[in-house]
């Protein structure tokens, strides 16, 4: 009887071991940052056209996402990644987590947003530039994101390095810290929890976000509650790619092609408030007023992969 039980158990284990291979032929898995959004219609369109079931895993901000993929690169958790950006791409390249090349899928300009109503009610002049945020008038009014885990946070850190130089950028951060800046772990926490302009419940009227974010805050009167500071922003490019050792490379190829298609890219502005890379994709008309691209950008041409750890160490010495 014990022998029979052992044989049955072995058979069950054998069948269980075969299951993932069977699933790989019918399912493709996408891992993305928490801000990734896709409509039910797009999911249905992809599944019908490709024949693959789509599974989505969300893995935090771009920094957390990239770090998790590095830790699991020998046994990847997905077939395709969406959301590694130009601030964390160096980590992906250094660790060989991508099969082939990362392909640009969208872009957005990292810049500060402020709550117009908050400033109007208090008759306070809002900042004209992120350089103003160290002034006493804006004490304890600003929330940024951690450059160790957040791609907008690392983007803004690079912006300050580009603006002040390797030897002087720390002084800006010391002054910002002394002026009561709040540091959130990621963009979603900063924007939806701490920023007053997104929900009305946050305690900070200035937040590190994107030039397109005010388009998400249009009120019934046709005006946006928020505005963006459009000078000296950081152009953040997000990428999509097939993970090395992906279980379903055929499905991965189909999914990457779909994410770059005109059909899916048309949905990106309204769902994720980013600019699509497909030139045929349609940009919402209201974006020209409420979500324009930055007037000027700075920092994205730096060698972030080479200097990232040194900058982060200097930043951590101020905030830890």
Region spans (language model):
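A structural signal for short loop-to-beta-strand junctions that line the ligand-binding cleft
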Residues: 76-81, 96-116, 130-132, 140-147
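A bilobed periplasmic-binding-protein/Venus flytrap-type ligand-binding module shared by bacterial periplasmic
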Residues: 113-118, 236-251, 267-271
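Short beta-strand->loop
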Residues: 99-105, 131, 205, 218-234, ...
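Short, low-complexity disordered leader/linker segments with a strong preference
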Residues: 1-28
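Periplasmic-binding protein-like
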Residues: 140-148, 258-282
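Ligand-binding pocket segment of bilobal, Venus flytrap-like solute-binding proteins
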Residues: 159-231
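Early extracytoplasmic/lumenal segment of secretory-pathway proteins
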Residues: 18-91, 199
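Periplasmic solute-binding protein
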Residues: 86-96, 104-125, 149, 153-163, ...
């Amino acid at each position: 009887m014990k022998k029979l039980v052992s044989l049955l158990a072995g058979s069950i284990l054998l069948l269980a071991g075969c299951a993932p291979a069977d699933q790989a032929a019918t399912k493709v898995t996408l891992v993305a940052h928490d801000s990734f959004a896709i409509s039910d219609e797009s999911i249905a369109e992809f599944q019908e056209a490709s024949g693959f079931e789509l599974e989505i895993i969300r893995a935090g901000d771009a920094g957390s996402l990239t770090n998790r993929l590095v830790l699991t690169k020998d046994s990847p958790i997905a077939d395709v990644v969406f959301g590694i950006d130009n601030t964390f791409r160096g980590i992906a390249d250094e660790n060989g987590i991508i099969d082939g090349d990362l392909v640009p899928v969208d872009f957005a300009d990292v810049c500060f947003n402020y709550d117009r109503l908050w400033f109007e009610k208090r008759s306070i002049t809002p900042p004209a530039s992120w350089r103003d945020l160290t002034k006493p008038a804006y004490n304890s009014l600003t929330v940024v994101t951690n450059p160790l885990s957040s791609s907008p946070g690392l983007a803004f850190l690079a912006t300050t390095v580009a603006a002040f130089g390797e030897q002087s950028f720390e002084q800006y951060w010391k002054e910002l810290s002394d002026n009561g800046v709040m540091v959130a772990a990621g963009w979603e926490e900063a924007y939806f929890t701490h920023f007053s302009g997104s929900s009305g419940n946050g305690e900070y009227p200035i937040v590190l976000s994107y030039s397109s974010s005010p388009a998400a805050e249009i009120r019934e009167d046709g005006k946006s509650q928020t505005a963006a500071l459009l000078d000296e922003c950081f152009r953040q490019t997000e990428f999509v790619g097939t993970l090395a050792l992906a279980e379903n490379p055929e499905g991965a190829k189909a999914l990457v092609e779909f994410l770059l298609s005109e059909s899916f890219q048309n949905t990106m502005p309204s769902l994720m408030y980013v600019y699509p890379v497909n030139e045929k994709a349609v940009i919402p008309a209201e974006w020209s007023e409420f979500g324009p691209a930055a007037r000027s950008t700075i920092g994205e041409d730096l060698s972030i992969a080479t200097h990232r750890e040194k900058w982060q160490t200097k930043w951590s010495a101020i905030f830890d």
